[in-house]
Amino acid sequence: MNGVAVSIIFQRFFLKGQKGLTPDGTLNTILTTLGLDPILWFDVDRPFLANCCLVFISIWKYIGFDIIMYIGAIQSISPDLYEAADLDGANPWQNFRYIVFPSIKPIISLQLILAVKGAISVFEIPYITTKGMMGTTTFVIKTINTAFSLKKVGLASAMGIVLLIITIIVTFIQKYLSLIHISEPTRLQL
């Protein structure tokens, strides 16, 4: 789903109005109906709460893709492996530990790489939801502001290159660590 659409939907869920400063969004309406006080979700004094809301939005946005990847990986496991494990007397935990988990390790590695890359270069959700205010500024938002608000295009380009280098280094480290773990043999011990 488009990150802009998701951000606008959740902005209305947490806050109402264009400025985002009034705590009368859908969630606070529910809290008030339950007899609780409304909460200012995106507040300058509580950047932790604002960042938790952004994490929740990001998880909601990407969880469908992640689940589809894992379901596809699990369904690609040969039924013969499960049959052999049943004949050997494996319980469900052993099936998971020795058949499912080793079979989906490459997908877990890919998902971790995509998650870290996305976390490093996150832009649309915090920018649309909070405009990068209230302690939610990311490196990419800072880069965009440097380029367009401060008119320092050269500095913004250098910041983009630094982000690219950091992303490549982190990806190589993750790939190296995942190759070490994937190459380790696992034996079924009953």
Feature locations, PLM:
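Cationic, low-complexity basic patches in intrinsically disordered or flexible, solvent-exposed regions
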Residues: 190
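A structural signal for multi-pass alpha-helical bundles of membrane permease subunits
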Residues: 1-179, 183, 187
